[in-house]
Amino acid sequence: MDSDDDMHDMDSVDYDYYSGGTYDDNDSDETDFGFGEADTDDAAIIASYRSKSNYVVLKEEDIRRHQNDDVGRVSAVLSITDVEASTLLLHYHWSVSKVNDEWFADEERVRRTVGILEGPVVTTPDGREFTCGICFDSYTLEEIVSVSCGHPFCATCWTGYISTTINDGPGCLMLKCPDPSCPAAIGRDMIDKLASKEDKEKYYRYFLRSYVEVNREMKWCPAPGCEHAIDFAGGTESYDVSCLCSHSFCWNCTEEAHRPVDCDTVGKWILKNSAESENMNWILANSKPCPKCKRPIEKNHGCMHMTCTPPCKFEFCWLCLNAWTEHGERTGGFYACNRYEAAKQEGLYDEAERRREMAKNSLERYTHYYERWASNQVSRQKAMGDLQKMQSEKLGKLSDIQCTPESQLKFIAEAWLQIIECRRVLKWTYAYGYYLQDHAKKPFFEYLQGEAESGLERLHKCVEKDIEVFELAEGPSEEFNHFRTKLTGLTSITKTFFENLVKALENGLADVDSQAASSKPANSKPSSKTKGGGKGKGSSKNGGSSRNPDGN
């Protein structure tokens, strides 16, 4: 455990984690908390709280509007129908500039490649009856349907063909004429005309999703059931985004938001949490293989006399793994094994014991970090539930009791949102700590982590416990304004501290390196004098560090 002196030294490291945040009980109550006046919806509040200029959350109607705008632009510039423009954009992955460049470079080649034909490729036979190219039945002209190529098929076969391809998946967006040798594209007009209502919904679902899935700057929100997309502009170091559904995730890897940990570390941590490797570590640390059948056996009683499970039933000594029949008073009796102790002194069991001890230590270390990682996740989920309960049940009552409009109580929601965000950050600091290889940085990291936990607990207590006296009051209290100032102050300080903590961890705790580097001249002074046998001109110049605690 770190001494008090160590803690003081770490606290003196030249990094202002509290810069920008002040707490004063006498601060003015006229504070703008950054929320709208009327919108109390959870999603809107979270979106407002986490909104950043480097991304935009798109609803389905927004995506559809973007699609229609692109289709209209291509249609106007190339003087083609909207259906043909849609077909071109699908082929060129919704790139308007690519469509224009390719079209004006070689229109004929583009038409041939995409399947937008200028005229029929087959001659319509004279007569009142036509033969369907799929079922080969005869139909009148009114019952025959064809696209730009002119191949005749009956409406029933067309419907079946379209339905089959739509139910096969997104490939239906590149649908071609049923004739195997024909490249003619089938556009949205045929879907509207011949597909069933259910098939139309599926087709346009694929059509909508194609706009996002081919765009490198857009991704769907990975939350189950969410139908929003994120348009990410970049330009910042953070990939964390928040959807209107309140789900926060990393735009780069689509895992949950995980600052200050990088995506590679998150991938390793998640894999470790779900992999069988930890089960094997537990088995290795807490069991030994049966000397006869080699199955792992856990020792669950105090006696060293072990009996393997049927059908093996081999009896052996837990310490030396030899047959129990060889044990008696000469080997130490039932609860000790002189043979094992002697062999251990000779080094015969050192390797196996060392492996088992290493596995046990590794498991204990992993368990330490995982339990705290998971605990903060549970606390975060509970805080989200408490926020929802506060907004749906308690806020109105508190407004009535304190005679304060709900629009002036948004500071409470802001505090809860800060707690939710801090729990997320604190949770991932444990994954950061697990993979932190530089042992010199560990004490400072754990100090910062401890300070973060302490500050967060103060904020959590204030918004969860201290508010109860005002919720249970019979009328307005003069102390409520003091509570408002206290809570907003704690929220601001906690936010600033966690923001600086994230930056410090993302920079690899560079301040520890800089502190070590700046202390090297002072530390090297004694050795310089020893080597030189006295104060030379150079040693005198280098020895006058202001960081020397003796002041020499």
Swiss-Prot record:
GO biological process: protein ubiquitination
Binding positions for Zn(2+) 2 per the UniProt entry: C149, H151, C177, C182
Bias kind Low complexity: ranges: 514-530
Gene3D superfamilies assigned: 1.20.120.1750, Zinc/RING finger domain, C3HC4 (zinc finger)
Region of interest: Disordered: 513-552
E.C. no: 2.3.2.31
Pfam families per the UniProt record, alphabetical: Ariadne (PF19422), IBR (PF01485), IBR_1 (PF22191), zf-RING_UBOX (PF13445)
Keyword Nucleus: no
CDD domains from the UniProt entry: BRcat_RBR_ANKIB1 (cd20346), Rcat_RBR_ARI7-like (cd22583), RING-HC_ARI6-like (cd23141)
PROSITE patterns the UniProt entry points to: TRIAD, ZF_RING_2
Residues reported to bind Zn(2+) 5: C290, C293, C308, C312
RING-type zinc finger locations on the chain: 132-182, 290-320
Binding residues for Zn(2+) 6: C317, C320, H327, C337
Domain of life according to the entry: Eukaryota
Matching InterPro entries: Ariadne (IPR045840), E3_UB_ligase_RBR (IPR031127), IBR_dom (IPR002867), TRIAD_supradom (IPR044066), Znf-RING_euk (IPR027370), Znf_RING (IPR001841), Znf_RING/FYVE/PHD (IPR013083)
Cofactor(s) needed for function: Zn(2+)
Expression by tissue: Ubiquitous.
Entries under SMART domains matching the protein: IBR
Catalyzed chemical reaction(s): [E2 ubiquitin-conjugating enzyme]-S-ubiquitinyl-L-cysteine + [acceptor protein]-L-lysine = [E2 ubiquitin-conjugating enzyme]-L-cysteine + [acceptor protein]-N(6)-ubiquitinyl-L-lysine
Cofactor comment: Binds 4 Zn(2+) ions per subunit.
Group of enzyme by EC: transferase
Sequence positions that bind Zn(2+) 3: C221, C226, C243, C245
Family: Belongs to the RBR family. Ariadne subfamily.
Domain notes: Members of the RBR family are atypical E3 ligases. They interact with the E2 conjugating enzyme UBE2L3 and function like HECT-type E3 enzymes: they bind E2s via the first RING-type zinc finger, but require an obligate trans-thiolation step during the ubiquitin transfer, requiring a conserved active site Cys residue in the second RING-type zinc finger. The active site probably forms a thioester intermediate with ubiquitin taken from the active-site cysteine of the E2 before ultimately transferring it to a Lys residue on the substrate.
Protein name: Probable E3 ubiquitin-protein ligase ARI5
Organism per entry: Arabidopsis thaliana (Mouse-ear cress)
